[in-house]
């Protein structure tokens, strides 16, 4: 590894050495020697030695079944430890340029100053700053919570070892602790034995809040406040709420039959319980700190005649929180609850705590007010009384099925067979009516009843407990109105954001037309109060049309929605359903946000954080602070220094690129007769369905083919065999087509001057760097019928041609020239991922030869899947 990454190299080497000790102790010198032989052969094979590559293949083929799992685990664990060392390095004091993000906020203020942006405009943009991260339980988080907790403790040890004044005995003790943690991880089961329930997933999300965000958000706000003070002369108002959290865990029932209304209710109770539990810890700490006597009349009034007024108020809060925990416990167990007052909204915490804060300032104790008390006040604004706001997500046809069954029962026809205009007339008429629509004597089918019961659960909650109701596969205005009607019929007493999710290429292209139709309806305009949320689907659009075409459709849809909302004086919040991989919209946060259309971040940012990306971006408080800094600086920059409007010739060329890339993508995925058999044979797609990752089935329709596969297993499968097909197919071909048509200069101009286009090419470069055509060929030879080999050859040839086309436009000699650290990081991992790929191909071969599944082979296969996911730094 390059010497400028010496501190990171040292940590990786130390962790690898300690892992080696653990393997020796657990399995003996012989197995460790075998692992080391494979590692060395992988390294020399990577350097270009065909002899060593063949030797590596033979070494892996010759492994007996009982050695497959420990060898796979050795490489998998090393990659997990490397990820931890790398994540730690980004926040360590030894972090080098190109590895760590520069100070994003300070860089932003320099740019604002250079562009003469006024203080007034900047202050206004800061006041409007809104970052809402939505934690989702997509089944991409391979690592079990058990393993994640151990990795967090390893991070703490690395932090201690970095201290320059650490004593020899303390260093020895910390290194010993590291070795213990690595041994604990080795002897723990790396793979879940059972598929997690939706409740397990929600608990995982709450653990992220407790272990990282509970500290990370107030830390970010404290740092951000100081930067604003330094640059603008005024900090964040005490009641500012620039960051808040939502969740889909326990609310996302799209294609997941296990998320029922009962589960949603249970998750919401658990969310409140966890919030009360965390606030109780804060309050207990404040009781120990705030022993002051002097106070204002307001605090004296709240405290009564107690000698220590602040403690008296805090003890009242402690009683409230204890009673809340007791009440929620009883509710979760289905027992009778007490009638004592409990925490129901954030104001119950805010008012007494804020009174204490103001009193301390008024009495000359501002320095005390600005300590732990301020952090707790910031938490009250960020997390409320419910920790996270829960979104509800359901597929559009589930709502129309309710109305169809109902209208047939009422004898007025079949709603599903009506024209769109007839549906809208019926829905608006019912929404405007004061009489109920649902008859008392109607007994719906179980599926329909579940949708109705979900709406009733929503109606029982407080508004601040809920985010938005997301309609997946939204296609028409009636899809949105139908949800409003069902919520109204359930007795929902507040206005809930109903958010259409436009996912496919056609739906994205029609999104403006759908919203214009909704805005033309008087009832709808009156109800939404000039605020609209729309969700842009990244994963399904890319699966439908390929990344280039989907990317342009997403951009065009955002632009059109911004335009129509501006004309209608409606405040638009765009909700981005991004994933961790390029094929699902993943990109470095800062670049991705700055590549969006002008004005698309005016209403703030709402974005899903999914699976393993939650851990990479938010898993440690310090890492979360970095992520929030990047989000905040990008949103402020996009709003104060918007990117250029694309020139007409750029748009025209993007239309061509989109059309050509979509056709190229679909010709393979839909038009190639051998594609589905090839996909099933050359990737672990069928085996992945057995992996106990998330609570949600891998297919929307269990009997369907590729088209019914969810976007996550679709991309996950291709990432495993290193062809990563969905993240590049069609894009390079379209670029080469445009070069051949004489547009190279225009492409180069777009690359230089248009953030949208340059970000797309940067994402492609990263994907190409992670691809391994040689490994994909090995999977073909080991696993597929010879009749399918020509398709594999064709795809790999296309990949090589695409790489040349992109490098040509960028005037680069090799991939990721502008990101040497990213390239180096991938190179380092490849030495450990390659043996896992070869092991996986061998395991798939052996498994598919057997009539009955061998638990031994299945376990080893699961370990390789987890290891490759860790090495690729993204799954689905």
UniProtKB/Swiss-Prot annotation:
Reactions it catalyzes: oxaloacetate + phosphate = phosphoenolpyruvate + hydrogencarbonate
Keywords for the protein's UniProt record, in alphabetical order: Carbon dioxide fixation, Lyase, Magnesium
Role: Forms oxaloacetate, a four-carbon dicarboxylic acid source for the tricarboxylic acid cycle.
The keyword Hydrolase belongs to this UniProt entry's keyword annotation: no
The organism's place on the tree of life at top rank: Bacteria
Pfam short name (any one): PEPcase
The protein, known as: Phosphoenolpyruvate carboxylase
Required cofactor names: Mg(2+)
Family: Belongs to the PEPCase type 1 family.
Organism of provenance: Aliivibrio salmonicida (strain LFI1238) (Vibrio salmonicida (strain LFI1238))
Disulfide bonds: none
Active site: 138, 543
GO MF annotation list: magnesium ion binding; phosphoenolpyruvate carboxylase activity
InterPro entries, A to Z: PEP_COase, PEP_COase_bac/pln-type, PEP_COase_Lys_AS, PEPCASE_His_AS, Pyrv/PenolPyrv_kinase-like_dom
